[in-house]
Amino acid sequence: MHGSCSPWVMLPPPLLLLLLLIATGPTTALTEDEKQTMVDLHNQYRAQVSPPASDMLQMRWDDELAAFAKAYAQKCVWGHNKERGRRGENLFAITDEGMDVPLAVGNWHEEHEYYNFSTATCDPNQMCGHYTQVVWSKTERIGCGSHFCETLQGVEEANIHLLVCNYEPPGNVKGRKPYQEGTPCSQCPLGYSCENSLCEPMRNPEKAQDSPPRVTEVPSTRATEAPSSRETGTPSLATSETLHFSVTKVSDSLATESSPAVETKAPSSLATEGPSSMATEAQAFVTEVPLVSARHMQPSVDEGPVNFLTSTHIPVPKSMDEEASKSSATSVSPKKSLYPKMSLTESGESVPQIQEEAEPKDELSEPEAILPEAEAAPTEAEVELREPEAESPKAESPEAEAESPLSSEALVPVLPAQERGGQKASLEHSGHPASPSLPTFPSASGNATGGRTLALQSSWTGAENPEKADWDLKNSAHVWGPFLGLLLPSLLLLAGMV
């Protein structure tokens, strides 16, 4: 009677021992946890570099690189793969029973003790290439493979676990530093966001593209159109209830568009689209500031509906009318100013033209307000008082005075506009005589591309300028002097007859 026996018992002892070694032998593939640990440790060391990196990319696992690394690890060669192409590579070997991923990455990172970042050099007789590859900022993909080698070519010991990691894009470019020093994430590429001091790719790259500034167009129904200024002499006006504005295009009627622009641009002629059109861009202010432009500019725009004064137009000699006919303009100012500032926009090329038109070549019947060109821009906190350049003839109204502006690069806060003689403030556009009543205007700032930035503050009151008060007294003396000379003999004759 034969008893049953296991087939394992029938095997020769040497073969059975070999099968047991194969069954219980060390594993050669990295587990999912080991792969994640590999990526996490790389990113941890990359985020903690010293000095900090401004362009360090976040590293992620790549299966193709892992397969390439595994294929080379199976060759059991202690040396870099000469056929790796455009791939970086780090190697690690251990004679213990299993692979230790934290120990491998930690050994690579310890090489930073021998690396001089300022000179991008390694200490003599030391290795730094593993560390520089770990922290190479442009590298963002890693794939690793391990293999158990009974014999490792180039090493005397037996039974070694070999770890091979490949990187893309490769690091260790000769003559270059591993990363750019600076504030973390301050130089991330387009399409990347900041995560734990590393530049992480955005999930939706389309959102990373620079979108143009949002422009909100004002509907045509909100604009009040008027006939062309060339045909009727009255410029077209349009207002918007937007809080901020930056682009104003005028072609027979003004319309405002809202966008976060910061500069004021004006071409030399200030007329680019049609006979009566002009294109300007004004800065969006933090506080709502009504704008009043002097020459070819849009009227003031406020948060709510704005009421404008009736245009002031005083006839002038033919030479001035011909010059003014080239550009339609009118005097516009708010009836009641709620803000102490307004904007005076000037073009660098048109400033001499404004000054040339403002200089009186012939005596006029009305006094003129002169806007002199600043000879030199003063420093911040330096304000230069300038005398008026034009001599005004006799004023028909005792309230008419000459202008004495202040020149500065910064905005000069002043008192709000004052009303005198029951008349409202009026700002001249293109060199026409000013209105009989000239009140104190707030400060005005100018910002033009290709020109100069000026802050002008006009002082109109005679009490603030003693010279102007003396000018009024002298004029009154000149007027009454001849009459007193004629009346005195008559009075003496009458006294003798009596």
Curated annotation (Swiss-Prot):
Glycans are attached at N116, N447. Residues 383-397 have a biased composition (Basic and acidic residues). N-glycosylated. Residues 39-167 form the SCP domain. Residues 204-277, 317-407, 419-467 are annotated as: Disordered. The keyword Iron does not apply. InterPro entries: Allrgn_V5/Tpx1_CS, CAP_dom, CAP_sf, CRISP-related. Expressed strongly in aorta and skin, and weakly in adipose tissue (at protein level). In heart, found in the extracellular space surrounding cardiomyocytes (at protein level). Interacts with PSP94/MSMB. May inhibit cardiomyocyte growth. This is Peptidase inhibitor 16. The lineage of its organism: Eukaryota, Metazoa, Chordata, Craniata, Vertebrata.
